[in-house]
Structures are given as structure tokens and as C-alpha cells.
Amino acid sequence: MVSSQPKYDLIREVGRGSYGVVYEAVIRKTSARVAVKKIRCHAPENVELALREFWALSSIKSQHPNVIHLEECILQKDGMVQKMSHGSNSSLYLQLVETSLKGEIAFDPRSAYYLWFVMDFCDGGDMNEYLLSRKPNRKTNTSFMLQLSSALAFLHKNQIIHRDLKPDNILISQTRLDTSDLEPTLKVADFGLSKVCSASGQNPEEPVSVNKCFLSTACGTDFYMAPEVWEGHYTAKADIFALGIIIWAMLERITFIDTETKKELLGSYVKQGTEIVPVGEALLENPKMELLIPVKKKSMNGRMKQLIKEMLAANPQDRPDAFELELRLVQIAFKDSSWET
């Protein structure tokens, strides 16, 4: 990428995940900072995750301040580099699509295939790191709730179901902070498990409702998964559930220790004896279970408590959609100054 595509200079590695490495980079012409994610296409699962992210982000025709923006995606094979576009007839692109669909490598495995995603650079880490390194702050909580609900409404309006909402996948941008009064900007990221709901039926031009787009692949991160996701039959209402877990945990600073990474993470759960169980899993076993919200007295008022309970309803039909959620959070934030003590 550095030699074949001199548009960017890589500065340093800032993150490494299960299927890619993220670098801080600069655009040579403007010196603007960007994030560049390098994904090696050596396994079908890597290719599928990368294509899902590309399809979701490239399907968005307008930008949203709280959704990560894809500047461009570069496909590299050995020394050959080309810009990737959705629906391209390029043989390299079609080989990746075939690999994703068939679940087996559809190109010469001796060739080095890479995808380079050029996106917004976020300098403040993720939501998990940001909140847990600071004392609880009502103003920050309010700002984050409004930003996240706005992002989710935007994604659902664009027929995108995220399917892996969690604090680790929400990035923090502090570049706009020119005064101490401003809260950082959140950006929903990591669309590797996302699903773009395409139109079907008699009128393919009519936008499909993400709340009527049923999916069957159980995916996500267990502590944020809705009960119907565990069951394998769900819609975009699963994103509402995940956001409910995040907001509840943020307001009350509920955390757990990840057994694999030993990292402290924001996330609410149910206690069963000495064990902690994901809320969605517990509700699948007992849909009538009453969640103890709030855990701490006076941590939220009745309207906030009721909204979180609805977001975490065992029956997805009892949850608000993303547009109602955004409206109700705005009302709580601005019409009821005593939502949190």
C-alpha cells in the first residue's frame, strides 16, 4: 500500500483485531489524519467480515456524525492495487464475493490479497475505555445516549442492522473539542457482522423495514445479544436490545470481567448464584423474569427506568423502534431535567 498507493502514509499501528490491523495514517495531499484498516483475505471468514463491512458502509449515501465514514476501500493483490466499488465486475472483487458465498478460497492461495479500508480517525479510543477511565458524569451520559440513538435511527433508516453493538465497537473522536464544555463525538464502527436488508417482493423500489427483515444467523457478543438472537430468529429490534444493555450499564456503571481478555467491560447482566449470565440468555430461559432496574436507588427516574425496561423486553415487539427511541430520549433529556440524580 505504501509503495503502490502513495496517497497515504502510515504512521503507526493503533489497534489489532481478530481479522485486521488498524493504522493511523495521513493523506499526503492534505495531511489530514485517517484510519486505515488492513485486512488479509486469507480465510473465507475474513473475507465475509470484510465484505459485510464494505457493503454496509458503501451503501450509505450520506454521512452521519455518529457513524464511522468509509472514505474508500482499496483491493490489493500482490503488486496490483484498485479501488473497490459495490457491484464491480472486477475479477478480483468477484473472486472475493465467490469466496464469501461458497465459504472457500476462490483464488490462488499463494497470492497475497488485502483490503485496505480508509475511514475516520478516532483519537479517543473506544467508549469502554473512555467511560471507565473517568468518573460518572450526567452530561456525558446524556450526550452519549442521544448520539447513539441518533446513529441507530440513521442506520435503520438506511436498512442496516448492526448486530454487534457494544462499547468496544463505539469509537471516540475528541478532535472537535476546542472548549471544555463540549462532549466528545461517538462513532459507531465495526460493521463486520452487519446486514443490509435489501428490498424484495412485488415492489423492489420500496424501502424494506428493518423491523420486518428477519435474520437467522446467531451472531454478536453474548452479553449484548437479545433473547431472539440466541434463538436464531430476529430483526433490527435486536439492536435496540443491545443499546438498552449499553445505556443501562453506562448509567449505573455496571461492569464485568471478560473471561478471555481479563478486561473490564461495561455491560449489564443477571446474577444466578455466583455466576453472571447475559440478560438475553436469561430472558430466553425465563421471558417473564423481572429485571432489577435500576440496581442502585436514585440512579434514574421513572421515565428512564421504563424506557430501558421496554428496550430490554423479552418480546421484541414490545420494544420501541429506533425512531421512537430517539424521540423519547430527546424528550427525557430536554423536558425532564431530573432524569438522573
UniProtKB/Swiss-Prot annotation:
Annotated active site: 164 (proton acceptor)
Binding site for ATP: 14-22, 37
UniProtKB keywords: ATP-binding, Kinase, Nucleotide-binding, Nucleus, Serine/threonine-protein kinase, Transferase
Tissue specificity of this protein: Expressed in liver, kidney, pancreas, spleen, thymus and prostate.
Protein kinase domain: residues covered: 8-334
Superkingdom to which the source organism belongs: Eukaryota
The UniProt record lists the keyword ATP-binding: yes
Compartment list: Nucleus
EC number, as in UniProt: 2.7.11.1
Disulfide topology: none
Pfam families to which the protein is assigned, alphabetical: Pkinase (PF00069)
A Gene Ontology cellular-component term: cytoplasm
Any Gene Ontology biological process: negative regulation of G2/M transition of mitotic cell cycle
Alphabetical list of InterPro entries matching this protein: CC_SR_Kinase (IPR050339), Kinase-like_dom_sf (IPR011009), Prot_kinase_dom (IPR000719), Protein_kinase_ATP_BS (IPR017441), Ser/Thr_kinase_AS (IPR008271)
Enzyme type, top EC level: transferase
Record PANTHER family: EUKARYOTIC TRANSLATION INITIATION FACTOR 2-ALPHA KINASE EIF2-ALPHA KINASE -RELATED (PTHR11042), SERINE_THREONINE-PROTEIN KINASE PDIK1L (PTHR11042:SF58)
Name of the protein in its database record: Serine/threonine-protein kinase PDIK1L
Native organism: Homo sapiens (Human)
